[in-house]
Structures are given as structure tokens and as C-alpha cells.
């Protein structure tokens, strides 16, 4: 299971990269239940890290929430909200409200929300670029600036 392979990776950015490389972006081949399992484990880890004053789970939680959005439906909103609002402001700002709004409205474009197809494309494009950046970074696994919003 993916969690067993990643649980000893200290930094969230490295775990995020590991999951993206293992899962890829062919959402028809990704098990939604595995993403839910990974999200719950990462959430538990984030709570433990916060209690020990070492907090580094934002990027990994964001990646896994993005995967859940791409695979999910309205029934997944409570888990996305639990993660978005249940830890701290860092995680809250990393999880896009647009993902939750899109699941609530059936993926239809409105004044503040792109279509589900556009949001998924933005997620994939961002993380493909992020992987490329990590691959060629002098310093290792550092993500692009968080100035890209979907």
C-alpha cells in the first residue's frame, strides 16, 4: 500500500511528489478509497506534527485533496472540509474552496467557479509543472511559488 511506502518520508513536499509519481493523473485507474485512506492518515499525521511543533503536511494534504476532488462527488465534501478547516490556516488556504463549491454545484461553471473539467485540468497542469520544477531544481524538492490559483 502507498501509505506504507511513504510514511517514513519526513517532508510533506517529498510525500506529495511520491504520491503524484506513483498515482499519476489517469483518474480512471486511481482508487478513490485509497485516496480517502491516505488523506485520513495525512490528517492524523498533521495533527500529531502540530502537537509536536513540527508542522509540514500542507503540500501533501493539498495534493491528496486535489486527487479526491478529481475522483470525488458531493459525498466527499465533509472530508475536504474537515481537512480544510480542521488543522490551521496554512492548510485552510492550501485547499481550494473552488473544489468544494464545484462538488456542491455539480461541476457547473458559475460566477466564482470554473467548470469541473477546467479545475481538473488546472490541477494536473500545475502538478505536472511542479514535478518538472522539482526534477530540475538545484535545491531538491521545492514547489513552485503558490501564486498559481485555479
Question: Can you say where each PLM-predicted feature lies in the sequence?
Answer:
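Generic helix N-cap/helix-start motif at coil->alpha-helix transitions
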Residues: 11-19, 56-62, 88-94, 122-130
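Amphipathic alpha-helical scaffolding segments comprising HEAT/armadillo-like alpha-solenoid repeats
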Residues: 1-6, 29-51, 73-84
